[in-house]
């Protein structure tokens, strides 16, 4: 009688045992999120009325529409902040590793800063940084 061996076929490939804590953590986090979402749905309010659909205005009853247009300069300042905040993050990352990067890293970050400064000068010349009463007089 000949014995045949059946290969161990699994849906999941064999993973090293070091991944077991990560897998358990992932499963536990997913289950916890599911339980919390289910509890919020189950315990949450089921009724809706006109007052629940209004935006919260610190207890003051709203008198007009909440959909007001913001002036464009606020949007521009927010975009400028994001651009230069990302620049600061890149420069900080470069500064933490400047010894390892050497001269090549210095050349790259200098090029990066020059490009951003040229963009800032162009923006300034186009009037993108002018807002308020002085811009309205032009």
UniProtKB/Swiss-Prot annotation:
It is found in: Cell inner membrane. GO terms for molecular function: NADH dehydrogenase (ubiquinone) activity; NADH:ubiquinone reductase (non-electrogenic) activity; quinone binding. It is a multi-pass membrane protein. Its EC number is 7.1.1.-. The chain crosses the membrane at residues 19-39, 74-94, 103-123. It catalyses: a quinone + NADH + 5 H(+)(in) = a quinol + NAD(+) + 4 H(+)(out). One of its GO terms (cellular component) is NADH dehydrogenase complex. Keywords: Cell inner membrane, Cell membrane, Membrane, NAD, Quinone, Translocase, Transmembrane, Transmembrane helix, Transport, Ubiquinone. It comes from the Bacteria. It is an enzyme of class 7 (translocase). Pfam families: Oxidored_q4. The keyword Transmembrane applies. NDH-1 is composed of 14 different subunits. Subunits NuoA, H, J, K, L, M, N constitute the membrane sector of the complex. Belongs to the complex I subunit 3 family. NDH-1 shuttles electrons from NADH, via FMN and iron-sulfur (Fe-S) centers, to quinones in the respiratory chain. The immediate electron acceptor for the enzyme in this species is believed to be ubiquinone. Couples the redox reaction to proton translocation (for every two electrons transferred, four hydrogen ions are translocated across the cytoplasmic membrane), and thus conserves the redox energy in a proton gradient. This is NADH-quinone oxidoreductase subunit A 1. The lineage of its organism: Bacteria, Pseudomonadati, Thermodesulfobacteriota, Desulfuromonadia, Geobacterales. The gene is nuoA1.
